[in-house]
């Protein structure tokens, strides 16, 4: 369910206006893609004039980059919070899977900008997406390294597997009209992930 556009003339602080413009842009970009979206449509969706939009963003590319960065940072924050949510590896692996499902199912379809961008060939946009992936892998690999005692290359490979499983599973679940309830879908994917991770005993347990 989308929010109704703010009527023209509504006075907002600069920060609130920027947030409003980004929300409107996310809806337009998610619905039409970068190339088909226009500043006219974004301004109309936000309920502002084009000059107001250009006061905050000099062009469509800059607006897209700002939105992509915010969406990518949201994903990274979700994954980091999941890893930090528990010291139990099984709970952490489920939380990491759930982080991707919640990001994909979130309002505004921000995930489409990160995972399905039609601007992947633009260097700065590609760098933002790669940075988000790297930071997610860093968080998961660090936990695997600490708990399983694996060296960084092997821990990172496991992290890539968990990220791929979570991301693709969540996207398929959404594209398939959520064929099973969200919690059940998360449990299924988490059980698959844990079936692999459980094969690596915690180094702290091995030392006892």
Region roles according to the model:
Residues 112-115, 182, 205-206:
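Short, hydrophobic secondary-structure boundary micro-motifs
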Residues 35-36, 150-153:
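Short, charged helix-capping/linker segments at alpha-helix termini
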């Amino acid at each position: 369910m989308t929010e109704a556009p703010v009527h023209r003339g509504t006075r907002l602080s600069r920060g609130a206006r920027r947030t409003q413009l980004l929300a409107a842009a996310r809806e337009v970009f998610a619905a039409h893609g970068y190339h088909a979206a226009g500043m006219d449509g974004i301004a109309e969706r936000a309920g502002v004039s084009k000059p107001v939009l250009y006061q905050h963003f000099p062009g469509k590319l800059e607006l897209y980059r700002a939105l992509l960065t915010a969406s990518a940072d949201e994903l990274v924050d979700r994954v980091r919070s999941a890893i930090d949510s528990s010291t139990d590896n099984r709970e952490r692996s489920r939380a990491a899977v759930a982080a991707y499902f919640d990001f994909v199912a979130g309002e505004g379809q921000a995930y489409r900008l990160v995972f399905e961008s039609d601007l992947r060939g633009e260097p700065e946009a590609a760098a933002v997406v790669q940075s988000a992936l790297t930071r997610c892998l860093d968080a998961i690999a660090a936990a695997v390294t600490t708990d399983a005692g694996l060296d960084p290359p092997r821990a990172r490979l496991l992290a890539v597997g968990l990220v791929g499983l979570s991301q693709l599973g969540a996207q398929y679940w959404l594209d398939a009209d959520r064929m099973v309830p969200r919690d059940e879908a998360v449990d299924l994917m988490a059980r698959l992930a844990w079936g692999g991770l459980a094969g690596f005993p915690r180094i702290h347990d091995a030392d006892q």
